[in-house]
Each structure stands twice: as structure tokens, then as C-alpha cells.
């Protein structure tokens, strides 16, 4: 069975708790969109884990997790997160895989993100982690995917500073790289949980544009981020909380301000 968990508001609805609960019955957990700008906080045996890129299912021994094609991967933040898991006794080796079509956040993108937002007449309130710039490069067909890391001709066009940044992570990234659509076909008869990031109102297409994230945070992102057809998504859970909040700028129906 294929089950999707997505935020139905502006994020911070408590998706992590729901994912953690449903992951008990799943063999595989796939995060399908977003990057290090989003995250889930899980408490296990009184210990708090803040996960920004690694799917929450990694906390269950024996579960395999995937970072999908719709994600943008910050290698520095990813391996810091994996080190945190190792330091807390979580054995993740051989259980974390990344789609070869996922794009990579390069150092220059972070600074570009901040400068672009500061230059706007109405700043969006970006996290400054390079997420929007990476998605922009993806749309402009200038991005770097995991699939490109051992493509010599492609990498020859990458700035030396970015090559130097990637060098310490290259071998490990390549060892975690998979064709996720082929993998999903291979495990099609298993229980797979798809973990969303942020929320429907931050979706690039259906959210409160332009005050949105750059990724597909709606349920359709589970299909585009994994290669599974939308008709094969058996259940979709939208997570709400009783009172609405949002981070960053943009409209919110229940907001009070000085003129209210």
C-alpha cells in the first residue's frame, strides 16, 4: 500500500508525529520534495531528533528511506544530519538512498538566495539555504543532479569552488544514488510511506504565490518525486492543526496586525 502524508496548511502541522506513527507499518519511507529548509522533529524515548532531509522512518531499525527526485540535496547539511544520527546510536548505513534525479544545493546558491530575496520590493522571507535558487537552476536546466556527479563532460562546466565543495562527499553520494522509479517498481508490492514537507498552502502551484516554497508540497509531489503514478497512491492524509501558523511573509486569514 502507498500512503502519502502531507501538510494541509502552511507547514508545522505536526506531520512528523503522524509520519512517525504510520512508519511502524511501512517497510519504506520516501521524502518526495523540499530540502534542508523544512524538517520534522521526532521524540523517541525522550530523545529529540530534528530531521531536515532524512525521512523520519530512519529512526526505525530495518526501515529503508529514500530522498526523492523532487528534493534538493545539501550535502553538507545531509551528512551533518547523518552524523548526528550515528552519534545517537542510529545505524543508517545501507538504509538511506537518494534519487539520481535529485538536484544538489551548491554553496553559491545560498548567498544568491539571500541577495535575491533582499533585492525584492516585497521580500518573500526565504530561509537563505539556497533552496529556491537550486529549484530555479533546475527549471533553467542548469542544475547539477546526483546523476551528473560522475559525468565528466558535465562536471567540467562546474566551477572549481563547487567541485572542491563536492569532493569530500562525492564517493558517499554516489554510493547512495539510485534510480528511484526503477526501485519503486521493484518494491511495488510493499508498504511505502511518502513523507511530505511544508504544506499545501506553500505549494509552488496551489499555494499563496509568491509567498510559497519552490517545491511540490502537494500530494502530487509524491508521484513526481518517486515515479509512482497518482492512481497508485492508495491513501492521502492531510494534516491540520487547530490553530494556523505560518513562517515567513505572506497572507494568513486569521492573522492579527496593528490595523485589526
Q: Which residues fall in each region the model found?
A:
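Non-transmembrane, aqueous-exposed alpha-helical and coiled segments at domain scale
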Residues: 1-260
Amino acid at each position: 500500500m502507498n500512503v502519502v502524508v502531507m501538510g494541509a496548511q502552511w507547514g508545522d502541522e505536526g506531520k512528523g508525529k503522524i509520519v512517525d506513527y504510520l512508519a511502524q507499518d511501512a517497510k519504506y519511507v520516501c521524502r518526495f520534495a523540499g530540502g534542508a529548509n523544512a524538517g520534522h522533529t521526532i521524540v523517541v524515548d525522550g530523545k529529540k531528533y530534528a530531521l531536515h532531509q532524512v525521512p523520519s522512518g530512519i529512526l526505525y531499525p530495518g526501515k529503508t528511506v529514500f530522498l526523492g527526485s523532487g528534493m534538493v540535496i545539501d550535502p553538507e547539511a545531509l551528512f551533518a544530519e547523518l552524523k548526528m544520527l550515528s552519534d545517537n546510536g542510529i545505524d543508517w548505513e545501507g538504509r538511506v538512498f537518494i534519487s539520481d534525479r535529485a538536484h544538489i544545493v551548491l554553496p553559491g546558491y545560498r548567498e544568491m538566495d539571500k541577495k535575491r530575496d533582499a533585492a525584492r520590493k516585497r521580500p518573500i522571507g526565504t530561509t537563505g539555504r539556497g533552496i529556491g535558487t537550486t529549484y530555479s537552476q533546475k527549471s533553467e536546466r542548469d542544475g547539477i543532479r546526483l546523476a551528473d556527479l560522475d559525468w565528466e563532460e558535465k562536471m567540467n562546466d562546474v566551477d572549481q569552488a563547487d567541485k572542491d565543495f563536492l569532493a569530500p562527499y562525492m564517493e558517499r553520494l554516489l554510493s547512495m544514488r539510485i534510480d528511484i522509479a526503477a526501485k519503486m517498481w521493484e518494491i511495488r508490492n510493499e508498504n511505502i510511506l511518502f513523507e511530505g514537507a511544508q504544506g499545501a498552502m506553500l505549494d509552488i502551484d496551489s499555494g499563496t504565490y509568491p509567498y510559497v516554497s519552490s517545491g511540490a508540497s502537494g500530494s502530487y509531489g509524491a508521484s513526481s518525486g518517486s515515479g509512482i503514478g497518482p492512481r497508485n497512491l492508495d491513501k492521502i492524509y492531510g494534516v491540520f492543526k487547530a490553530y494556523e501558523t505560518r513562517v515567513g511573509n505572506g497572507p494568513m486569514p486569521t492573522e492579527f496586525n496593528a490595523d485589526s
